[in-house]
């Protein structure tokens, strides 16, 4: 055995398994499934370790495609309960403006641990709040993910359109465009792992049409294409956002995304989309690489790969994804 590899583990004779030709389980080595063991067979190469799984059901690792780890610290804030998106954000922004490095480490660890306990082995997070002193927020998240052993697509979120510029967030949680782009490039160079078997990847993630400038949206698309990384954003979450885009940008959210160069191909983009648009521009063209984590996407089904996501972690719930998977499987 190569000294650089870990011992093979045979997860043996599961009660049930969601895979064909694996009735006797799977063999795992170095974080990969290297063999499916069919009924009546033994592993081709003897496993060094065996886990008796006769009381267990073996499922693939679940993938969470949207989260806000830091919001786990503000669950069930009374003033934020039962509010629409914009008022909800306005209540919580002042609390998030007080985030510290320790708070980001704690919230990231908590959120990822909850996801792992629910069967999630790969997660995305969208961190976009960077008050003074939290410039290394994504570095802290990378360290937490590595410590826990969870694969992660961590997005370098951003906001540069504050209240004084006609945006929603307060001035003390936004950054300027040059700072955002420079840090985005730094994080990709330092942490992004391309190719098969990647453990940590970085994506670029302007928060929303009502919290970033058009200039930043366009510059992010250009940078993502140059660095060959994905993009991520919120889009068409509420009717408030639709109205905002019509008033400020003179178009609906999806049309605005196209104007900003986000629908031109490249590595692809992912949206956390909550409400179904009412305009005739209801979906991206099928050839455009996209993933959407929506609440209702029946009319978008031909064009999109749907995914499970955790939205508003500041709600009084844990980051358990199993119940959401059931919903996805039923639709």
What are these regions (language model features)?
Residues 1-45, 56-58:
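N-terminal metal-binding scaffold of metallo-dependent hydrolase/deaminase domains
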Residues 14, 31, 55, 66, ...:
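Divalent metal-coordination and catalytic microenvironments
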Residues 61-72, 230-239:
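Histidine-centered catalytic micro-motifs
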Residues 75-126, 131-151, 181-196:
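Alpha-helical scaffold segments that flank or form the walls of functional sites
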Residues 76, 164, 239-251, 279-284, ...:
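Histidine/acidic-residue-rich catalytic or RNA/ligand-binding cores of hydrolases
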Residues 131-273:
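Metal-coordinating catalytic core of metallo-dependent amide/deamination hydrolases
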Residues 259-266, 308-331:
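His/Asp/Glu-enriched, well-ordered alpha-helical/loop segment
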Residues 276-278, 284-321:
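A conserved active-site cap/scaffold subdomain adjacent to cofactor or substrate pockets
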């Amino acid at each position: 055995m190569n000294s650089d590899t870990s011992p093979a583990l045979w997860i043996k004779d599961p009660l049930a398994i969601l895979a064909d030709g694996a009735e006797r389980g799977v063999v795992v080595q170095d974080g990969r499934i290297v063999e499916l063991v069919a009924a009546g067979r033994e592993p081709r190469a003897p496993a060094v370790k065996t886990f008796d799984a006769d009381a267990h059901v073996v499922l693939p690792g679940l993938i969470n495609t949207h989260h806000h780890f830091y919001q786990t610290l503000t669950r069930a804030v009374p003033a934020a309960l039962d509010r629409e998106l914009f008022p909800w954000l306005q209540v919580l922004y002042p609390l998030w403006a007080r985030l510290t490095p320790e708070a980001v480490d704690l919230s990231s660890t908590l959120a990822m641990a909850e996801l792992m306990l629910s069967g999630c082995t790969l997660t995305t997070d969208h961190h976009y709040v960077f008050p003074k002193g939290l410039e290394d927020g994504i570095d802290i998240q990378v360290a937490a993910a590595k410590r826990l052993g969870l694969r992660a697509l961590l997005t370098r979120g951003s906001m540069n359109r504050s209240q004084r510029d006609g945006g929603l967030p307060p001035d003390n949680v936004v950054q300027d465009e040059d700072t955002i782009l420079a840090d985005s490039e730094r994080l990709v160079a330092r942490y992004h792992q391309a190719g098969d078997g990647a453990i940590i990847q970085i994506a670029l993630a302007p928060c929303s049409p009502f919290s970033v400038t058009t200039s930043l949206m366009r510059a992010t698309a250009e940078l993502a294409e140059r660095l060959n990384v994905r993009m991520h954003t919120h889009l068409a979450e509420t009717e408030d956002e639709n109205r905002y885009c019509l008033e400020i940008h003179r178009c609906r959210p999806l049309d605005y995304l196209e104007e900003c160069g986000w629908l031109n191909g490249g590595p692809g983009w992912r949206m956390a989309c909550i409400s179904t648009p009412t305009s005739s521009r209801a979906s991206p063209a099928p050839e455009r690489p996209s993933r959407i984590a929506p609440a209702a996407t029946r009319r978008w089904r031909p064009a999109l790969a749907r995914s499970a996501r955790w939205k508003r972690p500041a709600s009084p719930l844990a980051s358990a994804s199993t119940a959401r998977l059931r919903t996805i499987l039923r639709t």
